């Protein structure tokens, strides 16, 4: 996908922002949970996002790689009220209905966003 960085003040969700939305589980798309997502672009009316977690996957990197999940550290941000370090999953892009975005949590730093974009493209 075309990855862009264009956060702008206002109510619209823009690439480069971390938002909260419902994310389906991979193993059963009928179930999921509310979590932070980094918006990386658009696909017509859909938003494209990468899920975030505060779980440290460096500890289970071998298992995650074996399962086909790739993670990248992005540090802390206002999307997490406890300011815990976060990781972004770089090999699962999620399509999100803009109406399903619950709130905008923060804008990700441009340099970190560019690093994430490069990792997604790799």
Language-model segment annotations:
Residues 1-35, 39-122:
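Conserved functional hotspots at enzyme active or ligand-binding sites that engage polyanionic ligands
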């Amino acid at each position: 996908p075309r990855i862009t960085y264009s956060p702008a003040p206002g109510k619209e969700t823009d690439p480069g922002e971390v938002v909260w939305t419902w994310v389906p589980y991979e193993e059963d798309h009928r179930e999921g949970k509310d979590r932070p997502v980094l918006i990386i672009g658009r696909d017509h009316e859909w938003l494209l996002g990468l899920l975030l977690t505060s779980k440290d996957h460096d500890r289970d990197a071998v298992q995650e790689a074996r399962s086909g999940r790739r993670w990248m550290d992005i540090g802390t941000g206002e999307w997490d009220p406890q300011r815990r370090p976060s990781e972004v999953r770089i090999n699962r892009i999620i399509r999100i209905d803009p109406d399903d975005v619950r709130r905008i949590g923060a804008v990700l730093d441009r340099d970190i966003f560019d690093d994430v974009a490069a990792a997604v493209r790799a």
